[in-house]
Amino acid sequence: MEEKVSLKVRVQKLGTSLSNMVMPNIGAFIAWGVLTALFIADGYLPNEQLATVVGPMLTYLLPILIGYTGGYMIHGQRGAVVGSIATVGAITGSSVPMFIGAMVMGPLGGWTIKKFDEKFQEKIRPGFEMLVNNFSAGLVGFALLLLAFYAIGPVVSTLTGAVGNGVEAIVNARLLPMANIIIEPAKVLFLNNALNHGIFTPLGVEQVAQAGKSILFLLEANPGPGLGILLAYAVFGKGSAKSSSWGAMVIHFFGGIHEIYFPYVMMKPTLFLAAMAGGISGTFTFQLLDAGLKSPASPGSIIAIMATAPKGVWPHLNILLGVLVAAVVSFLIAALILHADKSTEDSLEAAQAATQAAKAQSKGQLVSTSVDAVVSTDSVEKIIFACDAGMGSSAMGASILRDKVKKAGLELPVSNQAISNLLDTPKTLIVTQEELTPRAKDKSPSAIHVSVDNFLASPRYDEIVASLTGASPIAEIEGDIPTSAPVDSQEIDLNHIDAVVVAYGKAQGTATMGCETIRAIFRNKNIRIPVSTAKISELGEFNSKNIMIVTTISLQAEVQQAAPNSQFLIVDSLVTTPEYDKMAARMYK
């Protein structure tokens, strides 16, 4: 079983290393796409002088950035410099944009100078360090430049041409939609960025240089399949999965954070069929209508997709139609699956944990049930949220915990980054999703590691804050995590509630989502009680026993002090808690 785990981790590392050379530089790709869309001959604002910048950016800037980043990943600044020099050799030794060559020469340059330093660094006599370091980087880079110019560049150019011809043949044979049979499951299994930015982006940029647009940018970024699945949960789902799907739809479709719908698919693995069918139908529509984008859409938001579409009304409508078809097809299939489902489990959070545990165990992984050390302000100096790409859901998770840490009066930095960029530093608390914890531990064994089911709604955040403030230690077993506060919702006289208020501190986002979740549940149960949000400083207006205030464990004391006469429902998450369904079942208004 250990061999299977290590193989899986190695595959993830390979895919991640490719995407991590591209993702930090997506801004440059977007800048090039905007420049192309505006100033080339058929752009929105044709300009011959500015159009001359398009070619050099494509040929030199973008590959050198990739090579620089690849070298930096291996050996810091010295690796980045040598990787850039080597990449120039590949660029000038070829007649095609050298993205794949940059992905080879960048890490190779970093690895070569790293091995040189390991062998000779300790042998340098005092006073000669700068001389040796500068000349070694220059000479190693020079040697790799010659190698890339005469060998790597031509070989990669031939391979790139072959791959491009293969993609063109697949497109001409109308077989491109079949790629979604692999793409959609891979997205849910943390390979979405590897596919999109490690494979499709380099190939797509070359297509844009030739044809002005590329359908490859739409294969993984299409939000249609996820939108259809979330909509099916909103109509045919049960419990907290149903009520939380509305907020998830907004984040997925407009925010472009596709990771938010992954747990909904993991809850019922048969929904992979809905995702694949939606992806296939969407790509088929894109291909039928000759749709494409001028640059990568990152994140996969409908706003970013529309912004990078070619000039004209029809190109935008063609893309929207492809997204719509994908959403409708995935919705219909997911609706059939959910409607036929007879299970009684209706807690998204519980199903998430069960699915993640079963998934990890089936792959030979041990589910992380405890932290590696005591969490306190003495043992933790910073908190890092780590994920495959270091963006998206980990950034949102970091934002949520950062807000909780500030409210607790702690001065701890909370940031997010890619697992591949983690350093082995002590006194660091690293939060990862269970699927990625083995890789994080491998990169940073000295850190304290905490696994969560879902970055966007985890009860472990309140546990971490409580442990850091000395209120209580982190629960050793995940199953022991409390799902509500000391105030028991069973004791609340629910039949004498005239209004429900969701309280928030500085950030209103999760409170708004929680408010919409409760409203959706009340509508389904025909409960006519108004639900609103309020800042803690405004709770004095709701200080009455016929008002129920909903808040989280971390804000409980502050909220009860602001409105001591109100009734309270304390939950672990304002969005995914099962307490809302239990509350509605006991209300008869």
Swiss-Prot record:
Any Pfam family the entry gives: PTS_EIIC
What is the main EC category here? transferase
Q: Which parts of the sequence belong to the PTS EIIB type-2 domain? A: 381-476
Give a yes or no for keyword Kinase in this entry.
yes
PTS EIIC type-2 domain residues are 14-347
Indicate where this protein resides in the cell: Cell membrane
Give me the Gene Ontology terms describing cellular component: plasma membrane
Task: Please provide, alphabetically and separated by semicolons, the GO molecular function terms listed in this UniProt record.
Answer: kinase activity; protein-N(PI)-phosphohistidine-mannitol phosphotransferase system transmembrane transporter activity
**Membrane side Cytoplasmic: which residues?**
1-25, 73-135, 188-274, 339-589
Which domain of life does the UniProt lineage start with? Bacteria
Q: Which NCBIfam families does UniProt cross-reference here?
A: mtlA, PRK15083.1
Question: Domain description from the entry?
Answer: The EIIC type-2 domain forms the PTS system translocation channel and contains the specific substrate-binding site.
Subunit field text: Homodimer.
Q: What is this protein called in UniProt? A: PTS system mannitol-specific EIICB component
Q: Which organism is it from?
A: Streptococcus pneumoniae (strain ATCC BAA-255 / R6)
